[in-house]
């Protein structure tokens, strides 16, 4: 049920929802605030982001030459910077585990962006305690 709602929420946010391909999804898990992630979850995000950053460094000659970057690289860079800001806020604020606030579901997916380019991402969807309403989403690019 919540996994289905998370997928519907994802589809509603996409430029081309018919192109959506779900790679994997988690079962609903308890959430303790919309900015609290377990150490394992944060470690997993940082590992994925490190791989993406490494790819970007190679493609842009350590970001010294982005003038010739293709649309895919520019889009990936934008998604990576957005995710990095969010992850840094989580880490530096060191949000303590709060009271149980609802549920979270993680979806790994592939889709096509507004430029028609295929991309992959990991999306976290936070629900209220009833598991009916989406409170927040958070996304990082996948390599």
Language-model segments: residues:
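Cystatin/cathelin-like cysteine-protease inhibitor module
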Residues: 1-143
């Amino acid at each position: 049920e919540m996994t289905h709602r998370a997928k519907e929420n994802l589809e509603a946010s996409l430029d081309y929802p018919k192109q959506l391909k779900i790679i994997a999804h988690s079962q609903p898990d308890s959430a303790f605030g919309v900015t609290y992630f377990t150490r394992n979850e944060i470690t997993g995000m940082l590992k994925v982001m490190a791989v993406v950053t490494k790819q970007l460094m190679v493609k842009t000659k350590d970001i010294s030459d982005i003038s010739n970057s293709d649309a895919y690289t520019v889009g990936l860079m934008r998604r990576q910077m957005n995710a990095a800001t969010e992850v840094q806020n989580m880490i530096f604020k060191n949000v303590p585990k709060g009271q149980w606030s609802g549920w979270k579901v993680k979806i790994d997916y592939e889709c096509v962006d507004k430029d028609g380019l295929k991309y992959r991402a990991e999306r976290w969807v936070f629900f209220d305690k009833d598991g009916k309403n989406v409170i927040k989403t958070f996304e990082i690019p996948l390599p």
